């Protein structure tokens, strides 16, 4: 009996460790894929730094972090739709362009390129990013 326990116990422990490592590995792969795709977002560095900070912060908090939380919970067998994420990234450029226009030449009540214009345009920008997240969430799995 003691011999069986010395053989079975290490095998049981190895099986438990293997079962715990597999979902974490898959989650890391899904997260790594999403982060790689988000790193392809290239905003124009010639724009004002406080504008770029606001634009990047919106993308990070309204898109990247929520999507990473979702794909981090996917099982290893789940297929992540890279096309869905790439489509979302192309729409990010359109939303960011709209944000920039409201911050710069389309600003009505304040001087163009001012912090006041940025504040006025930010709410609409974040709302559009949240809507994009809701759309993207529906198509993340293939």
Curated annotation (Swiss-Prot):
Compartment(s) of residence: Secreted
SS bonds (residue pairs): 84-139, 107-117
Tissue-by-tissue expression: Female salivary gland (at protein level).
InterPro entries documented for this protein: ALL3/gSG7_salivary-like_helix
Signal peptide: 1-26
Gene Ontology MF terms in the entry: toxin activity
Keyword terms, alphabetized: Complement system impairing toxin, Disulfide bond, Secreted, Signal, Toxin
Main location: secreted
CC terms in the record's Gene Ontology section: extracellular region
Role description: Salivary protein that potently inhibits the alternative pathway of complement system activation in the host while having no inhibitory effect on the classical or lectin pathways. Binds and stabilizes activated host C3-convertase complex C3bBb (C3-CFB) and inhibits its convertase activity. Enhances accumulation of C3bBb on immobilized properdin.
Note: The protein is equally effective in normal human and properdin-depleted serum indicating that properdin is not involved in its inhibitory mechanism.
Name of the protein this chain belongs to: gSG7 salivary protein
Biological source species: Anopheles albimanus (New world malaria mosquito)
């Amino acid at each position: 009996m003691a011999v069986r326990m010395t053989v079975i116990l290490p095998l049981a422990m190895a099986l438990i460790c293997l079962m715990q490592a597999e979902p974490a590995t898959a989650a890391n792969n899904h997260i790594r894929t999403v982060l790689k795709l988000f790193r392809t977002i290239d905003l124009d560095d010639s724009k004002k730094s406080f504008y770029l900070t606001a634009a990047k912060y919106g993308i990070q908090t309204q898109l990247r972090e929520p999507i990473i939380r979702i794909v981090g919970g996917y099982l290893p067998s789940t297929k992540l739709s890279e096309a869905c994420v790439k489509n979302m990234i192309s729409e990010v450029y359109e939303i960011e362009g709209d944000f920039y226009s409201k911050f710069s030449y389309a600003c009505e009540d304040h001087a163009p390129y001012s912090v006041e214009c940025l504040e006025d345009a930010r709410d609409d920008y974040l709302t559009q990013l949240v809507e994009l997240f809701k759309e993207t969430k529906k198509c993340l799995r293939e």
